[in-house]
Amino acid sequence: MDQPTPQPAYVLHSRAYKETSALVDFFTPQGRVRAVLRRARSKGGSLVRPFVPLEVELRGRGELKNVGGMDSAGTAAWLHGDALFSGLYLNELLMRLLPAEAPFPTLFEHYTLTLQALGAGRPLEPLLRSFEWRLLDELGYAFSLQQDVNDQPVAADGLYRLRVDAGLERVELAQPGLFRGTELLALAEANWEAPGALLAAKRLMRQALAVHLGAKPLVSRELFRKR
């Protein structure tokens, strides 16, 4: 029988399973994978926590794998305060939106870099907005920030609304929830210093993600509000 190849991974979520085991959701370059970790209270079980880079050996052909081996693969991103809530938010997005066992190697790399940046104390909002956009893009839900639904260039003096199923649509009358063309063009260039860019990015990503997340509130978002 072929020996499974260890692969890099992070723990997204874990919970007790039967008497001494844990059911663990991992994020790997091969996607989100669920596996049973037996003897979860052993030394290996101490690694089952978020933001720790791991090397895991997963066995089995079904959707529910077994952890054959697990080791630390580097220094954990020690997140505190708002950075911790931000990391938990990223994990919850991945748990809610990633299909099981669909490869996302580029997203995995971006996730790793984002955790490192959070641990280094980088400003949170640009990191979160960049990750949300990358996630939408990887899942096939992204839209152009430089062209509207009619294939016209986004105008700096224009007003736009998001049609989640299509993209940005120019409107003539001001109404709540619109985006200025200057803001959208700044986001297209990841120019977070532009006036209104960060706030517009937060509103835009929330609108874009909402339809895919559904009505169930994000636990991490509620925790952040109550901090």
Curated annotation (Swiss-Prot):
Mind naming one GO cellular-component term on file for this protein? bacterial nucleoid
By its UniProt entry, which InterPro entries does this protein fall under?
ARFGAP/RecO, DNA_rep/recomb_RecO_N, NA-bd_OB-fold, RecO, RecO_C
Q: Which domain of life is it from?
A: Bacteria
What's an example GO BP annotation here? double-strand break repair
Keyword annotations from UniProtKB, A to Z: DNA damage, DNA recombination, DNA repair
Segments crossing the lipid bilayer: none
- Tell me which family the UniProt entry assigns to this protein: Belongs to the RecO family.
Q: Which HAMAP family does the protein's record reference?
A: RecO
- Role noted for this protein: Involved in DNA repair and RecF pathway recombination.
Q: Which PANTHER family match?
A: DNA REPAIR PROTEIN RECO
Stated name of the protein: DNA repair protein RecO
Organism, by scientific name, is Pseudomonas putida (strain GB-1)
Q: Which gene encodes it?
A: recO
